[in-house]
Amino acid sequence: WTGAISGRGHGRFWVATGFVVIAHRFGYALEHGAANMPALLAHQCDNPLCQNPSPAHLRPATSASNSAEWASRRHTIGSPLRDLRGSLGRASALRDAARDGIELEPVAMAGLGVLDANQAPLWTESE
């Protein structure tokens, strides 16, 4: 997403004066139908700018399940949830890099603390 960003780092746009649409919810409705729109969508990728409507990225959730998942993943080394810039700072940096044609991975990594940047994983998915 390279447009406006909410205080929580989600893409957004205005469709009328005073009427804001959260971009990932709009994309999800386009992909899955407005009738199938859940009250809450969870970002499995922990990237609030993500616009990918596939279940690997966005899925229906409850407030309780979304909060529990956030709490369990915020301590994962290298997680976007650990970015020292906060969700808005991280989203703004990534959006600006995308607008400027800059590689996104170094920009994403720049917000991680020393522990996150230097910690090797204990195991990989293939093990």
What are these model-derived regions, one by one?
Residues 1-19, 48:
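Long, compositionally biased stretches
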Residues 18-127:
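Short, cationic Gly/His-enriched loop motifs
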